[in-house]
């Protein structure tokens, strides 16, 4: 059982692998999480000897905003996250600093600011974002998904919003074979989002792009049992003839 009493200035000590279950089981919203984190410290206890400690990055969000929490060698760091995205290293404050490189990018077509005496043409759509990185490094994926998210336009319905979410994260998908690390390939195993008001969890997997969903309100949320669903794998193709 994961529990912690926050009384006065008493510190709450948690193992890193308990952090997310503790936050979700203790805090109802982002403001409560911020308050709880003031009194919190994370230990260096590994989850298993097979999984050594690493620098960890978490994003905690609700409709009011988001924060980033990072467990680093020099302790725990908490940042306001105004872009609402997160990737791995470098640390979040460096990721945000690197966005300065892209302040000239725009979803609109560019003006000729190179030289007024040279006739330059807009030979393609999307030239306002030339320079937006497309490689698979964490810092490049951070910049690209931040740009995509902050400029994306969604419809009003839930289905349209869910659809747009998967398009946003699809902009930084990792395809098998494009990131080779000693003969092993980094891929996007799954993509997911949640309607926190309705309790509906949506996901896709690398091998199944059809959006699957679990409605958590259809389960007994007060049970002490762990409820599991088999991940739907294998591409589901809708034949039209």
What would you call each of these model-derived segments?
Residues 16-45, 158-165:
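Proteins synthesized as precursors that undergo proteolytic processing into mature forms
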Residues 3, 68, 191-193:
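Short, surface-exposed charged micro-motifs
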Residues 45-47, 53-54, 62-63, 85-241:
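C-terminus-biased signal that marks the final domain/tail of proteins
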Residues 10-23, 140-151:
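N-terminal short leaders/motifs
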Residues 15-16, 41, 52, 184:
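Short, glycine/acidic-rich beta->alpha junctions
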Residues 68-71, 77-81, 88-89, 203:
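Short helix/loop capping segments that flank catalytic or ligand/cofactor-binding pockets
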Residues 39-76:
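Catalytic cofactor-binding cores of redox enzymes
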Residues 1-13:
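Single conserved hydrophobic/aromatic residue that forms the stacking wall/gate
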């Amino acid at each position: 059982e994961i529990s912690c009493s926050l009384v006065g200035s008493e510190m709450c000590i948690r193992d890193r692998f308990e952090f997310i279950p503790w936050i979700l089981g203790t805090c109802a919203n982002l403001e409560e999480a911020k308050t709880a984190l003031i009194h919190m410290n994370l230990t260096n206890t590994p989850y298993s000897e097979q999984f050594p400690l690493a620098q960890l990055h978490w994003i905690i969000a609700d409709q009011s905003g988001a924060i980033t929490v990072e467990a680093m060698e020099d302790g725990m760091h908490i940042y306001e996250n105004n872009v609402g995205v997160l990737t791995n290293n470098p640390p979040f404050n460096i990721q945000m600093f690197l966005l300065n490189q892209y302040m000239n990018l725009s979803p609109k077509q560019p003006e000729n600011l190179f030289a007024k005496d040279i006739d330059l043409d807009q030979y393609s759509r999307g030239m306002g974002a030339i320079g937006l990185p497309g490689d698979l490094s964490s810092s490049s994926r951070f910049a690209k998904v931040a740009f995509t998210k902050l400029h994306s336009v969604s419809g009003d319905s839930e289905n349209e919003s869910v659809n747009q979410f998967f398009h946003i994260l699809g902009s930084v998908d990792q395809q098998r074979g494009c990131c080779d690390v000693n003969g092993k390939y980094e891929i996007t195993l799954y993509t997911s989002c949640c309607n926190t008001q309705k309790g509906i969890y949506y996901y896709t997997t690398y091998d199944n792009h059809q959006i699957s969903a679990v409605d958590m309100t259809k389960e007994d949320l007060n049970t002490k049992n762990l409820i599991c669903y088999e991940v739907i794998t294998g591409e589901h193709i809708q034949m039209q003839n």
